[in-house]
Structure formats: C-alpha cells, structure tokens
Swiss-Prot record:
It is found in: Cell inner membrane. The gene is atpD. This is ATP synthase subunit beta. The lineage of its organism: Bacteria, Pseudomonadati, Spirochaetota, Spirochaetia, Leptospirales. Its EC number is 7.1.2.2. It catalyses: ATP + H2O + 4 H(+)(in) = ADP + phosphate + 5 H(+)(out). NCBIfam families: atpD. InterPro entries: AAA+_ATPase, ATP-synt_VA_C, ATP_synth_F1_bsu, ATPase_a/bsu_AS, ATPase_alpha/beta_chains, ATPase_F1/V1/A1_a/bsu_N, ATPase_F1/V1/A1_a/bsu_N_sf, ATPase_F1/V1/A1_a/bsu_nucl-bd.
Length: 467
C-alpha cells in the first residue's frame, strides 16, 4: 500500500507528502491511525487537490484531534465506500457508512463508492405521475411528482423538519416504500427525535438514516448526502423499487462546501460561497433521478438565509426542482400549520392534462380567491370591511375559511398539539375545497375549518360551536 507523511495540519485540512511520487487520485480515501482520548482510531481523509511536487491536500472527515506532523498516512486506492442493501434498513450511519446507533454489527454483503456518475440519458424515464402526500395544501396547490424533486423552502423555525417527518410517516404507512434520510448539518436533537419517533411508529424498518450533524467537520457534512444517495441508488437499481430520499438540509450541503472551499484556499464568489457551488449542486442533483429500473422521489428541506430567496444557495437549488413548497413566516405567525404559502408554492404538474379538469379548476379558483383577499388587505386595514362591496365581503369570508382549512393536524405533532393527525386522500381534498369555494358552507364559523381533515370533519366540528 502506498504510504505518505503528514506535513501540515490546519483545522480539517491536511497536507500530505508521498516520497515515492505515487500520488493518490482525487477523491481517494486516506487512512490515518491516531490516538484520541487514549484510544487508537482510524481517521479517514479525502484527497481534494494535488498541490505540486509530491504533495496532496486532503480534507478530514472527522476530528483531527490527536494528529501530529510526520504521522504515517495510507492510501486506500479507492473512494469512500458505504454498505448498501437490506442490511442497512432500520439503522443509522455516519458519512463513512459506520453504524452510530449502538446496535449490533451489520453483515455487509456489498459496498459502493459514494462518488459515481449520474445515470446515462438512455436509462432515464420521463413519465409524469402525481404523488399523493395526504397533506391538503400540497396535494391541492403544489402537487409532488413521483420520481421528481421537491424543495421545502423556509427560514429558521417555520416547520421544515416537522413537514419532512410527516411526509416520512405518511409515505411509510400509506405507500410502504423504502425511505432514505440524509441529515446534513442539522441539529443532533432533531436526528435523535426522528429516530425515536420512527421506532415508536414502526416505520424504522423501511428506512435508512444517514447523519452528518452540525457539530461534525465540514468534510463530513459535505459528503453525507452522497453517502445517503448511494444507499438510495442501490434500492432503485438493484431491487427496482421506488425510493424516497429526504435531505435535511440541502443548504447545509452548500454551506459545508463553502467551508471546505475556504479551507482549501479557493477564491470565494458571490456572498462568500465557493466558486464551484453550481457544479457541486449539479453533481448531487443529477444522480437523484428516475431510471427505467425504479424511481427516486426526493424531498429536500432548503433553509433560506434571512428569508432571502435570492441568496445563491437556495437560488441554485431552485433550478433542479419540479415542485417548490414555500413555508411562510407570515402564515406560521397566524398559527396556521403547515405554514405553506399557497400563492408562492409551485409545481410543474399544475395543469389539467396531468391533474384532471376538476382538480385543476378547483386549485386555480382557491388561488384566485386567496390572491383577491391578499389584494384587498390594504383596503381592509385602512377603511375596514364595511367599505367593501357585497361580493368582496363574501369572498373575504370565504378566503378566511380557505386559509384556515389549509391547516392540518400532523401525526408527528400529536405529542405537542394533542390533536390526532389526519391523512386526507387527494379525492377528498378536491371534493372538500370544491364545496367550500362553491359557497355550500358559508354558514359555518371559520373556526370550524381550523386544524381539521376533510370537509366532513369541519361539519362535525361546527356542531360543537352551535351547541
């Protein structure tokens, strides 16, 4: 095995010299034996650049504590590889494919390198089919696509992770498919909560969790999405199933790339991001696709720094998405959850050919009513409701009911709200909103529409107010 020596350590960046001049290839994994807290551990680093002469620069994928100059480094001759297949189900892995849930050791039958080319054009499939989530506002106004990519955009604390947890819960229970969850640079507490909730709800056996949390070095946060994607690709290609890939949070992937880029001494571009931002995002997103063997449907939470959608990181992710679910702070401030913005959220399948005439007409009418209500806000604020025409008064009352009706109790939030979660089928969603916009339930109090499932639940709730 080819061996080198550490020449310099700056944080997570290692400069390593190979005396014989046989340099490892870019992205090869290097092994370094280190003593951490009195224990011998193998540290893995990944080759990033050849810096001239016989030296390379690598980024460590775990803490560099305990490393010293002159230490021996071994070139493994291949990129980082992670275990794939049924043995991974129900377990938590780190970026290197090691289990971190303190469970029994897994029997690895097959491993795959995390750096792989995207599928060729002739392997791709392009059929369009709506993916039912059971969440009213999404299914009605910004439907997801089977085998498509969806972005959940939102600032801090508007409910991206809760929405992802509900989607995992609904999909496991209603669709029975495999899910792969990539925790990229998010809170360890949330990762722990997700694991416990999955165990309690019984969906863990159909899920693989792959975590690179906030406290880990940038190299681990940058590569953990690729580790999770490699596991998802195996389910798609070898087993031929429809897989769900959840990434929380894709912004942290770009952020980690920015940190690595700065550590490697590259010139920053706009807003301090790495010059290779769109290349890195493209390399990841092009692999998340559907082939003739199976599909990967991906839902990616995208943190929006300072609620600015024009920031280069979220703006770069936009280009790859089929549907966008925008979470709004103004809506969450009203206490409406999920805080999905019905006017800002979009979907590429929002047309009558895919959705059917009835669904499309109802969705557009709901958006028209909400848009008109938004336009009238200034008049209402300055002059009051009395200055509106009779038609507008009816429309505003209906819009307020629709706004409340777009809220929904979640299964994963039962412990916080005490309200049992509701899964609403697409047909029930369309039927319910059709009846609301046609004025059949204008006589019901608007509070009856808050945090319910279908229109039948709202009618039942209204009986309690009358009593």
């Amino acid at each position: 095995m080819n061996k080198g020596k550490i020449k310099q350590i700056i944080g997570s960046v290692l400069d390593i010299e190979f005396e014989n001049g046989e340099l490892p290839e870019i992205y090869n994994a290097l092994e370094i034996e280190a003593t951490v807290s009195g224990k011998r551990e193998i540290l893995i680093a990944e080759v990033q650049t050849h810096i001239g002469g016989k030296a390379i620069r690598a980024i460590a994928l775990s803490s560099t504590d305990g490393l010293i100059r002159g230490q021996e480094v071994t070139n493994t001759g291949k990129p980082i590889s992670v275990p794939v297949g049924d043995a991974t189900l129900g377990r938590i892995f780190n970026v290197l494919g090691k289990t971190i849930d303190e469970g029994p050791a897994i029997t690895v039958k097959e491993t795959r390198p995390i750096h792989r080319p995207a599928p060729a054009f002739d392997e791709l499939t392009s059929k369009t089919e709506v993916f039912e989530t059971g969440i009213k506002v999404i299914d009605l106004l910004a439907p997801y696509i089977k085998g498509g990519k969806t972005g959940l955009f939102g600032g801090a604390g508007v409910g991206k992770t809760v929405l992802i947890q509900e989607l995992i819960n609904n999909i496991a229970k209603q669709h029975g498919g495999f899910s792969v969850f990539a925790g990229v640079g998010e809170r360890t507490r949330e990762g722990n909560d997700l694991w416990r909730e999955m165990k309690e709800s019984g969906v863990i056996d159909k899920t693989v969790l792959c975590y690179g949390q906030m406290n880990e070095p940038p190299g681990a946060r940058l590569r953990v999405a690729l580790s999770a994607l490699t596991m998802a690709e195996h389910f798609r290609d070898s087993i031929g199933t429809d897989v769900l890939l959840f990434v929380d949070n894709i912004f942290r992937f770009s952020q980690a790339g920015s940190e690595v880029s700065a550590l490697l001494g590259r010139m920053p571009s706009a807003v301090g991001y790495q010059p290779t931002l769109s290349t890195e995002m493209g390399a990841l997103q092009e692999r998340i696709t559907s082939t003739k063997k199976g599909s990967i449907t991906s839902v990616q939470a995208i943190y929006v720094p300072a609620d600015d959608l024009t920031d280069p990181a979220p703006a770069n992710a936009f280009a790859h998405l089929d549907a966008t679910t925008v979470l709004s702070r103004a809506i969450s401030d009203k206490g409406i959850y999920p805080a999905v913005d019905p006017l800002d959220s979009t979907s590429r399948v929002m047309n009558a050919q895919v959705l059917g005439e009835e669904h499309y007409t109802v969705a557009r009418e709901v958006q028209r009513i909400l848009q008109r209500y938004k336009d009238l806000q200034d008049i209402i604020a300055i002059l009051g409701m009395d200055e509106l025409s009779e038609d507008d008064k009816v429309l505003v009352a209906r819009a307020r009911k629709i706004e409340k009706f777009l809220s929904q109790p979640f299964h994963v939030a039962e412990v916080f709200t005490g309200a049992p979660g509701k899964y609403v089928k697409l047909a029930d969603t369309v039927r319910s909103f059709k009846e609301v916009i046609s004025g059949n339930y204008d006589h019901l109090p608007e509070q009856a529409f808050y945090m319910v499932g279908s229109i039948d639940d709202a009618i039942e709730k209204a009986k309690g107010y009358k009593g």
